[in-house]
Amino acid sequence: MKFLYLFLFAVFAWTSDAIVRIPLKKFRSIRRTLSDSGLNVEQLLAGTNSLQHNQGFPSSNAPTPETLKNYMDAQYYGEIGLGTPVQMFTVVFDTGSSNLWLPSIHCSFTDIACLLHHKYNGAKSSTYVKNGTEFAIQYGSGSLSGYLSQDSCTIGDIVVEKQLFGEAIKQPGVAFIAAKFDGILGMAYPRISVDGVPPVFDMMMSQKKVEQNVFSFYLNRNPDTEPGGELLLGGTDPKYYTGDFNYVPVTRQAYWQIHMDGMSIGSQLTLCKDGCEAIVDTGTSLITGPPAEVRALQKAIGAIPLIQGEYMIDCKKVPTLPTISFNVGGKTYSLTGEQYVLKESQGGKTICLSGLMGLEIPPPAGPLWILGDVFIGQYYTVFDRESNRVGFAKST
């Protein structure tokens, strides 16, 4: 019996004390910030395909560039440090991309987005190493560009040595001006990393900085409580979920891509009838899918299209909306109307918006569904690089 107690204590210690915890704060998305300012987001993005971007540029031996999503709806960020002594930055921990980039002290004085955010200064770091390789991420509104540098990267209690990252000297359009975060820390696979830069978590694994090669996200969907969530490096925390994790294999090691068996909207509509692919993406607030299917879904729940690609729902009808169910790995993950409808303040009034949006992701990467924060907020999610799988458990 004493041995059993010791064993249980060891297991609990791994799930709670051996992991590194990064608090996440929730902020108002770029889309909502621009809308609050009276700017027409659709006009700003006209011809840009909603700031879609390519991650991973072609070379003689590189994969085809893949169009994914934007950061217009990102809502959670946390802090990291770069250099010695540490320079602090806020970043979106994004499982839908693989690069770390931050604004550079050398950005142009005409780059307003850069001027409004924290900037990395290699001259103030004793561990900085010049690299100089040019990098660029193609957004619809232009190219975010700069050059690579190397320095130590501090995340919680972990110090990743010799991390390559992008110093951004040019940020496109107005979108990043309104961003509450300084940069992006990608947590997807190396395959989609621009310039073949090893992602931060890959460096953690190779330097044996984590107990287990997994990380997990808890996203708090209650806007009145703090913290906004937590990123756990090296494990999971039982206080954030009930029951057991159900795991599904990663079908393509680029994004955190999984197979979805189907979707249903109450008894009214079935989507993804022959199965489809989805990616699990912490950098996207909404759930997105092929536009034609999402339009059918919005019609089924009685949503009214707005000019910005969003859909509005009568707040009085939210409690009676049909349940949306996602069938993944033989399990059904359901969202009620209260869970997939977003309540926003606009002009002093509360409006209800659908948490789903159409997004065209063409072949060869797409079509894809994106399970963003609307989904992850209800299902605590673990990303397992050891076994290349994703696990879901009901959030507490």
From Swiss-Prot:
<keyword id="KW-0732">Signal</keyword>
<dbReference type="InterPro" id="IPR012848">
    <property type="entry name" value="Aspartic_peptidase_N"/>
</dbReference>
<feature type="propeptide" description="Activation peptide">
    <location>
        <begin position="19"/>
        <end position="61"/>
    </location>
</feature>
<feature type="disulfide bond">
    <location>
        <begin position="107"/>
        <end position="114"/>
    </location>
</feature>
<keyword id="KW-0325">Glycoprotein</keyword>
<keyword id="KW-0378">Hydrolase</keyword>
<keyword id="KW-0064">Aspartyl protease</keyword>
<feature type="disulfide bond">
    <location>
        <begin position="272"/>
        <end position="276"/>
    </location>
</feature>
<feature type="active site">
    <location>
        <position position="94"/>
    </location>
</feature>
<dbReference type="InterPro" id="IPR001461">
    <property type="entry name" value="Aspartic_peptidase_A1"/>
</dbReference>
<feature type="signal peptide">
    <location>
        <begin position="1"/>
        <end position="18"/>
    </location>
</feature>
<comment type="similarity">
    <text>Belongs to the peptidase A1 family.</text>
</comment>
<feature type="active site">
    <location>
        <position position="281"/>
    </location>
</feature>
<protein>
    <recommendedName>
        <fullName>Cathepsin D</fullName>
        <ecNumber>3.4.23.5</ecNumber>
    </recommendedName>
</protein>
<keyword id="KW-0645">Protease</keyword>
<comment type="function">
    <text>Acid protease active in intracellular protein breakdown.</text>
</comment>
<keyword id="KW-0865">Zymogen</keyword>
<dbReference type="InterPro" id="IPR033121">
    <property type="entry name" value="PEPTIDASE_A1"/>
</dbReference>
<dbReference type="InterPro" id="IPR021109">
    <property type="entry name" value="Peptidase_aspartic_dom_sf"/>
</dbReference>
<dbReference type="InterPro" id="IPR033144">
    <property type="entry name" value="Cathepsin_D"/>
</dbReference>
<dbReference type="Pfam" id="PF00026">
    <property type="entry name" value="Asp"/>
</dbReference>
<dbReference type="GO" id="GO:0006508">
    <property type="term" value="P:proteolysis"/>
</dbReference>
<feature type="disulfide bond">
    <location>
        <begin position="315"/>
        <end position="352"/>
    </location>
</feature>
<feature type="glycosylation site" description="N-linked (GlcNAc...) asparagine">
    <location>
        <position position="131"/>
    </location>
</feature>
<keyword id="KW-1015">Disulfide bond</keyword>
<dbReference type="Pfam" id="PF07966">
    <property type="entry name" value="A1_Propeptide"/>
</dbReference>
<dbReference type="GO" id="GO:0005764">
    <property type="term" value="C:lysosome"/>
</dbReference>
<dbReference type="GO" id="GO:0004190">
    <property type="term" value="F:aspartic-type endopeptidase activity"/>
</dbReference>
<feature type="domain" description="Peptidase A1">
    <location>
        <begin position="76"/>
        <end position="393"/>
    </location>
</feature>
<keyword id="KW-0458">Lysosome</keyword>
<dbReference type="InterPro" id="IPR001969">
    <property type="entry name" value="Aspartic_peptidase_AS"/>
</dbReference>
<comment type="subunit">
    <text>Monomer.</text>
</comment>
